[in-house]
Amino acid sequence: INHLSEQCHSELSFASHEINNQLSFIRSSYQLISKKHPEIKDFPFWAELGDAVNHIISYMERTGLYRYSFKYVPAKLNLTEFLYSLPDVFDEQFPNRANAFQFDTDTRNIFICADSKRLLSAFLELLSNAAEADNSYGSIQIHSHVNACGHTVTVSVTGKGSLSEINPSEMQTNPLIDADAPLTAQLSTPFFSTKENHAGLGLSIVAQVCHTHHAGFELYSRNGFTTAGITFPILAMDDMRNTI
């Protein structure tokens, strides 16, 4: 199964590369024609064509992120430092958004086994969704706590907005406790989206990163706020010595 999975993603990567090459040619041609013949910019069809090309390119970029979310190169990661680096990375990725960040996190150095690049892509998806829900100006809360068992840590991202349009009161999928919910599976299905003109890969990326990290994922709405939480196994001392 793993071999077939790797082969599938390899073929997808090749096909995506070829499609992106063709799209780059189309966009370059569109830009050249627009420059040589500025009078055609007033034609509605021409403007719609440019929007369509950009829209398809955006979809391909999103599928690229989804494809790479399957990769996993584990290493010891200081989760506390990682969380506090998120606002700066978010501001670089989304300079037009003015969200404030509030932290309520465990100040101890907590280590997990993770691929920092893939984990960052998952959290950027959650932060971006939280920002969009509050018109890119509201406050985003990042919370972390070590669970009662002492072996796991949960990180949650909360933003204003609800999931009322898909009407889940609460849902979760957590391999750590062997739980599942059909609605979570539906939301995490590639290209399923409640937004217009949306690629529908955000939660798919998050769910896949959680799966490769043996982490749990939960999502719920209460009192006009939506919270997404990820639960990680804490790296034990013996594991730290054996992790590169």
What residues fall within each predicted segment?
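Conserved catalytic submotifs in the C-terminal HATPase_c
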Residues: 100-110
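Short beta-strand/loop element within the Bergerat-fold HATPase_c
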Residues: 137-151
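Conserved HAMP-HisKA connector
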Residues: 1-19, 27
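Conserved polar catalytic motif of the HATPase_c/GHKL fold
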Residues: 124-129
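Short conserved segment of the HATPase_c
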Residues: 164-190
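Conserved DHp (HisKA) dimerization/phosphotransfer helix of two-component histidine kinases, i.e.
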Residues: 25-29, 42-98
